[in-house]
Amino acid sequence: MGGTINAAIKQKFENEIFDLACFGENQVLLGFSNGRVSSYQYDVAQISLVEQWSTKRHKKSCRNISVNESGTEFISVGSDGVLKIADTSTGRVSSKWIVDKNKEISPYSVVQWIENDMVFATGDDNGCVSVWDKRTEGGIIHTHNDHIDYISSISPFEERYFVATSGDGVLSVIDARNFKKPILSEEQDEEMTCGAFTRDQHSKKKFAVGTASGVITLFTKGDWGDHTDRILSPIRSHDFSIETITRADSDSLYVGGSDGCIRLLHILPNKYERIIGQHSSRSTVDAVDVTTEGNFLVSCSGTELAFWPVDQKEGDESSSSDNLDSDEDSSSDSEFSSPKKKKKVGNQGKKPLGTDFFDGL
């Protein structure tokens, strides 16, 4: 790292921040470990962060939030098995669903809007993916039980489809309008922790998957069976993992790691270009998002929230070009990129590859 990295705004809270989402004009939603969801107006020039509203949204932790495309509503899911839709300007709840008390609760791990501000998807700790329509009384319109570990991310594409990544090392491609079983990748022998699309202006769009080993694997859209490239860990540590990924531009990603750093990663050629920011505690980056205007990256780690200028040039990573791998040399990973899986998983009950469902997607 080549110098001091200064945050435009940095603030500590009493409780841990589990998720965040930027929306509207200089606004950010925060979901906390104590179940509260709060909305803040930020002014980087004045170095201010002003609470607009705050509410006790869940009895237990608020684990994930998602704002719809129009910025008018958001969904929050909690470890209490409750899902709520609310107005972003007031926090007032418009819809609520509760897991059947007679069933064993598997907490929701992730939620994401998919289509037309009406359809969204959830994933839970047991690997279940559900598609919801807020216009229906029961909410859920179809469910997929193809994974055997938690769902770590849901990434929509082309209006009706989405990719779900799982701790079991398998990703699934699902059509929100179709009840057929999803396309499943081969098991990757690495815990998938997050995912995001990139190279979206190119004919061969890529999907990047972060792993617990610190490796990022690239899948080609339409060829979901196995990864085509591997990008090795940016640091030499067996304890480093990729925790969160979000789009920077058509060819780059912001990558949050377990060391508290957010790095800019260029895709094809694959190179970690520089560190955007580093949290004070140097603990796991829990969530990242780009402000609506695109000039700041917002991240959280533990109780700390920070705003980082995306054009800040300190923190170049000159050695990152050495940490590359591809499908042509996948057996020559460096010694510090060995897989670090959460648990031993299998591929029992998975749909075999070779199906023609989603051809070309």
From Swiss-Prot:
Chief localization: nucleus
SUPFAM superfamilies assigned to the protein according to its UniProt record, in alphabetical order: WD40 repeat-like
Keyword ATP-binding found: no
UniProt region (Disordered), positions on chain: 311-361
Residue spans of the WD repeats: 57-96, 103-142, 146-184, 187-229, 237-275, 280-318
Subcellular location: Nucleus, Nucleolus
Pfam (any one): WDR55
Alphabetical UniProt keywords: Nucleus, Repeat, WD repeat
GO cellular component: nuclear pore outer ring; nucleolus
GO biological process entries: ribosomal small subunit biogenesis
Protein name: Uncharacterized WD repeat-containing protein C1A6.02
Species of provenance: Schizosaccharomyces pombe (strain 972 / ATCC 24843)
